[in-house]
Design a protein with these regions (language model features):
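Conserved N-terminal phosphate-binding loop of PLP-dependent enzymes in the Aspartate aminotransferase
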Residues: 1-149
Length: 149
């Protein structure tokens, strides 16, 4: 189980989504749910993912920050740098970037947005346009505070 330790040296040994990772009951339930969905249900998460990623890029530009966002479909990840990210190891943050992301996460929590400490975000069918607007405003406000620190 050492490979699942939080850090090995200064890098995560194996990233893990957590509780539901490879759980056969969860996977079966997810598959059953997907069989009931219409094709448009699969298109909506892609659309809102694109909307969020483009919105984040606009916020970073507005704040004149050298941050970036990666992702596909309903997933996105914020990176407080402009290094090329091709693998999960490329996304590894140095200690200053970790502190920056922790501050960013706390500022978002103050604005009622839960965001992982390593910058990962996940969207779903229940995500509304109002939710996206709230997220992007919270990111803009939070980055204003973080940048001023």
């Amino acid at each position: 189980m050492d490979v699942f330790a939080a850090v090995k040296g200064n890098r995560a040994a194996v990233p893990s989504g957590g509780t539901f990772t490879a759980n056969p009951i969860t996977m079966t339930a997810g598959f059953a749910c997907m069989e009931q969905l219409h094709q448009s249900s699969f298109e909506r998460p892609d659309q809102i993912g694109t909307q969020v990623r483009e919105g984040l890029v606009a916020v970073f530009a507005k704040q004149s920050l050298d941050w970036q966002v990666t992702g596909a479909g309903s997933l996105f990840r914020v990176h407080p740098h402009q290094r090329v990210v091709n693998t999960y190891r490329d996304a590894h943050l140095d200690s200053d970037e970790v502190a920056l992301m922790e501050s960013f996460q706390h500022r978002l929590l103050e604005r009622e947005v839960y965001f992982s400490g390593y910058g990962m975000g996940c969207l779903n069918l229940a995500t509304s346009d109002n939710d996206i607007e709230h997220l992007l405003k919270a990111v803009d406000d939070a980055l204003g505070v973080v940048a001023a620190q």
